[in-house]
Amino acid sequence: MYLANFELKDFRNFKELKTDFDPHVNIFIGPNAQGKTNLLEAIYFLALTRSHRTNSDKELIRFGSKFAGLQGRVHKSQLQVELKLRLTANGKKAWVNRLEQKKLSAYVGQMNAILFSPEDLALVKGAPSVRRRFMDLEFGQINSEYLYFSSQYRQVLQQRNNYLKQLSIKKANDQVFLDVLSDQLAGIAAEIISRRIKYIKKLNSYAKAAHSEISGQAEKLQIFYRPSVKEIIPEDNVETIYRKVITSYKKNRPNEIRKGTTLSGPHRDDLEFLINEKNAHDFASQGQQRTISLSVKLAEIQLVHELTQEYPILLLDDVMSELDHRRQSRLLNYIHGKTQTFITTTDLEGISWEIVKEPKVYHISAGTISAKES
């Protein structure tokens, strides 16, 4: 899979852009704060309809403009797909091959993209919300049902939390309605949790192999999904998970009413990374964090390929300078001939380009792009 051409209008600091891309390696070079990361963000947004940097789509629209537009043609092994997005202050619309999509879940997955940035170090040391967002973004683009259930979960969770707050301040007393919301939320939660268990198991297998190779077989990486409902185990099916979530709601009801919020479910779950049986959150050095993050990204590539039969587009935002020569070589060797790759950097020096053959280089300056001569 590769992005053959790309257009944008009024996105971040870009007024207008139209360009073709190389199917293999594309390098965006230029000083900081010129738009390199914004361009990668735009490509990522075209794929997932979400930014990795903000939850507010309004921030993506260029100051003084009423909307932003993105468009691109994606080549897959069997077909070509035209993608288009339009963002306004009121929301976004999506088109596939000029047909407007009624739901974004029908759009996401047409183009798969994996992003690796310095902020990914937070995957290990950051808050649980960082790891939950990671799961939702990555699993949502490979499974439209996961994306659908995640959207439904947020809506019903908000309803249930609002009603719990009403109960907490004595403005409501209908426990039967709370039962209805609990049953609905538990059913959706079970669908999400069962998929997370499945995908984390696969991701763990790929990441373990990648990490072993990068570390020279010196370290063993393990990734575990940690549901907030402690009774849930990996062998549970959807129905069993549902029953355990419902039981958790009933057990926690007095506390939930007192606090006015739902205390368990996918929105409270977490991931745990172990290095040689030790919790990486507490013990991993910065170098080990980088190796874990890199291993997870390489595992994502394999997971997407397994489930879609296509290699995703890889976006590397200012990470080459963060990796030593060995990790750079491992990364470039791993992706060579597999993925279309976009790399941002301020300087071509000090990077292991020996594996990359004739990359296409673009200069980014003040929201403009120009291809550099070979």
Swiss-Prot record:
Keywords: ATP-binding, Cytoplasm, DNA damage, DNA repair, DNA replication, DNA-binding, Nucleotide-binding, SOS response. GO terms for molecular function: ATP binding; single-stranded DNA binding. ATP binds at residues 30-37. Pfam families: SMC_N. It is found in: Cytoplasm. GO terms for biological process: DNA replication; DNA synthesis involved in DNA repair; double-strand break repair; SOS response. GO terms for cellular component: cytoplasm. The RecF protein is involved in DNA metabolism; it is required for DNA replication and normal SOS inducibility. RecF binds preferentially to single-stranded, linear DNA. It also seems to bind ATP. Belongs to the RecF family. This is DNA replication and repair protein RecF. The gene is recF.
